[in-house]
A protein has these predicted regions:
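Well-ordered secondary-structure scaffolds
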Residues: 58-60, 65, 75, 79-248
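Phosphate/diphosphate-binding glycine-rich loops and adjacent basic-rich segments that engage nucleotide
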Residues: 29-76
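Hydrophobic/aromatic ligand-binding patch that stacks against planar heteroaromatic rings
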Residues: 8, 27, 72-73, 109
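Aromatic/hydrophobic pocket-lining residues that form π-stacking "cages" and hydrophobic walls in ligand
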Residues: 24, 69, 106
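A glycine-rich phosphate/pyrophosphate-binding beta-strand-loop-alpha-helix module
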Residues: 1-25, 29, 36-38, 97
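Short acidic, glycine/serine/threonine-rich loops at helix termini
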Residues: 3-10, 39-40, 46-50, 92-97, ...
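Short gly/pro/ser/thr-enriched loop/turn and capping motifs at secondary-structure boundaries
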Residues: 1-2, 24-26, 42-43, 89-90, ...
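Core alpha/beta catalytic barrel or barrel-like domain that forms the active/cofactor pocket
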Residues: 1-4, 34-47, 76-86, 117-120
Length: 248
């Protein structure tokens, strides 16, 4: 409820989340990765289908959700896919049963289309990481990839998703996959690739060293303190997300 991945990247000045197909291919070839969104040439029918779903009240239709998610993935030519399916009060999948149904549908249809697919259910009953808000989340990601700060839950989920993809592609063990992840984080290669990708897609060229200057900082800050001792038992994550939307 705080926006998607592309909304986060839109907070990076100049970053283009919707490049043309040739630019997308070039960035992937030169850098090795590109975080982008749907373009008019990639699964063009999906946008029209979604608008129809909205009008006829089938936004929550499982088959249509499945086709919407997978159409873009399959059209981009993937050979392997790992999906992070959220479940909890901050997700559209409010219960584990709903999330399982969606996961099973996604995996079944993907495999039917010849795409190796795995879905991992992850908890969204609390904020992932220590930040909430587009720019703040990008800042935390930069600190993570620079190995300056890692939230335990964020690291665990990130490693699980990446390791599953590495196991699927390279046919290696989980332990070997974890070692590969730790190596590229510790030697700075992951950070270097991130910086190259941001620059190639129109963002700042030295974002790792100048991110505090390049990313927009708010002029208004307010600390909110707890007025009594105790443990946090539950977080209404959806309400927190809606508050952020109201704040802009």
């Amino acid at each position: 409820h705080t926006g998607g991945t592309l909304d986060k990247f839109d907070s990076i000045p100049g970053y283009n989340t919707k490049p043309d197909l040739e630019t997308f291919k070039k960035v992937v070839k030169d850098v090795g990765c590109a975080i982008i969104g749907q373009t008019s040439n990639l699964a063009p029918a999906d946008k029209k289908l979604y608008s129809i779903r909205d009008v006829v009240g089938t936004v929550e239709s499982l088959p249509l959700i499945t086709s919407s998610i997978l159409s873009k993935k399959i059209a981009s030519g993937l050979s392997s896919l790992v999906l992070d399916v959220k479940v909890g009060n901050g997700s559209f999948n409010s219960t584990i049963d709903i999330a399982r149904d969606l996961s099973n549908s996604l995996v079944r249809v993907a495999k039917g289309a010849g795409l190796h697919c795995e879905a991992i259910l992850t908890d969204m009953n609390q904020v992932l990481g220590k930040s909430a808000g587009h720019t703040l989340e990008i800042l935390e990601c930069i600190k993570y990839i620079k190995n300056d700060f890692k939230d335990h839950r964020l690291e665990k989920i990130t490693n699980e998703l990446i390791s599953s993809l590495l196991v699927n592609i390279y046919k290696i063990s989980k332990e070997e996959a974890y070692n590969k992840i730790n190596t590229v984080i510790n030697n700075g290669l992951a950070a270097e690739k991130f910086e190259m990708m941001v620059a190639a897609l129109g963002g700042p060229r030295n974002i790792l060293s100048s991110f505090e200057k390049d990313l927009i900082n708010t002029s208004v800050r307010k600390d909110v303190f707890c007025n009594k001792e105790g443990w946090i038992e539950k977080i209404h994550t959806r309400e927190l997300g809606l508050i952020l939307i109201e704040l802009g």
